[in-house]
A protein has these predicted regions:
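Active-site proximal beta-strand in glycosyltransferases
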Residues: 99-127, 140-143
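Short hydrophobic beta-strand element within catalytic cores of glycosyltransferases
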Residues: 277-280
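Nucleotide-activated donor-binding/catalytic signature segment of Leloir-type glycosyltransferases, i.e.
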Residues: 224-243
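Conserved acidic donor-binding segment of nucleotide-sugar-dependent glycosyltransferases
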Residues: 291-292, 296-303, 312-317
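Membrane-proximal helix-turn-helix segments that form the acceptor-binding/catalytic region
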Residues: 89, 124-142, 149
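Acidic anion/phosphate-binding donor-loop and adjacent secondary structure
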Residues: 125-126, 151-154, 166-181
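Conserved donor-binding/catalytic core segment of Leloir-type glycosyltransferases
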Residues: 175-193, 199-203
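Aromatic "clamp/platform" in nucleotide-sugar-dependent glycosyltransferases that forms part
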Residues: 260
Length: 355
């Protein structure tokens, strides 16, 4: 089978949607299928997109990557929709796709096709919601990636099935508790990830006598560098490789994520794959991080509350071990090959052999 994976916007965004596409694409190839990725555009002067995509997402297999356009500095919603409507179906047919799995719903004249609803919808206008509702009606199946997504899309589309996010578990090598450093890891440097909340929470822990440091992993951020320049207990690791990020995360005592919006809980899943207890905000779906089972949940953005949650993990070895073990067991359901098999079962239902 030849599967086309669609990214509505830019394939070079370093976000959860492209991580989803990367992991699912590799899993399909491991299962013996042909795969290509088609996106609207890419950012910057990136040669050999397939090789770049493989490296940045920590894949073992290179996947073909094509775009409708060349480099674009920003995602232009109306232009994207027009391009997908006029060019998308033709491109899929040219590349002999048997099915399209579309991430970021678009008007594409091709069948059969599956839409994957990712969210969040917090910044979507009333007009855009109406457009989304119409677009989803043109798809053969709609998949939600979590119960939170299913709830969020209620009123726009009814999800036919819930299939979890694909995660490449072999990339994570958890360290034993006694080998771990006194590190707290925060992932994400954009303002929505609230890294300064994490910085203040760790500062409070240090004021209480805990000898811990904070490592912030994410894209390069000048504003964040200015804000924390005087805080010697914080290390910024901008634009690190997947291998280095996972190595740090798997050696930490905890991961903290006081996010205001979390469409893709990949940071939480990666922490769990490391056996590193995540301390997360209300923005992370509660079917991913279960309080006191696979992590700790905080219902505010107050640094004191995050400091208190982190302190529980630092002081209570029994709680830390309980979450560590449960997280490692729970995350197995996100194995990218098993997730790909769920998609293939759905595709088999849709594409019935002709006699």
């Amino acid at each position: 089978m030849r599967i086309g994976l669609i990214r509505r916007g830019s394939i070079t965004h370093l976000d959860g949607v492209n991580r989803f596409i990367a992991n699912l694409a590799e899993a399909f190839k491991l299962l013996g299928h042909e795969v290509f990725i088609l996106s609207w555009s890419h950012r910057g002067d990136v040669e050999e997109l397939g090789r770049w995509f493989k490296t940045v997402h920590g894949l073992d297999i290179e996947v073909e990557v094509f775009t409708l356009r060349g480099p674009e500095d920003k995602d232009r919603w109306l232009t994207m929709l027009f391009d997908w409507f006029t060019k998308g179906g033709e491109m899929l047919k040219r590349f002999d796709a048997d099915i399209a799995i579309v991430n970021g719903v678009v008007p594409i004249r091709f069948k059969p096709k599956i839409a994957v609803a990712h969210g969040p919808l917090v910044s979507v206008s009333r007009l855009q919601r109406s457009v989304l509702k119409l677009l989803y009606r043109t798809y053969d199946r709609v998949i939600c990636v979590s119960e939170e997504t299913r709830r969020e899309y209620k009123g726009i589309v009814k999800c036919d099935r819930l299939i979890p996010l694909p995660l490449k578990l072999k990339n994570f090598k958890p360290l034993e508790p006694f080998k771990r450093a006194n590190l707290i890891v925060h992932i994400g440097t954009r303002p929505v990830k609230n890294p300064l909340v994490s910085a203040r929470a760790v500062e409070i822990l240090r004021e209480r006598g805990h000898d811990v440091e904070l490592v912030v992993i994410g894209g390069r951020s000048e504003w964040l560098e200015r804000e924390i320049a005087s805080k010697k207990f914080i290390r910024l690791l901008p634009d690190v490789s997947e291998e280095e990020k996972n190595k740090v995360l798997c050696s930490a005592k905890a991961m903290v994520l006081p996010s205001s919006g979390e469409a893709f809980p990949y940071a939480s899943l990666e922490a769990m794959a490391c056996g590193t207890p995540p301390v997360v905000s209300y923005a992370v779906p509660d079917d991913v991080v279960v309080h006191e089972h696979t992590g700790l949940r905080v219902e505010t953005l107050n640094p004191i509350d995050y400091a208190n949650a982190l302190e529980r993990l630092l002081k209570d070895d029994e709680l830390w071990t309980h979450i560590h073990r449960n997280a490692l067991m729970y995350v197995k359901r996100f194995d990218h090959v098993e997730v790909a098999k769920e998609y293939l079962r759905l595709i088999k239902e849709m594409i019935k052999p002709t006699r």
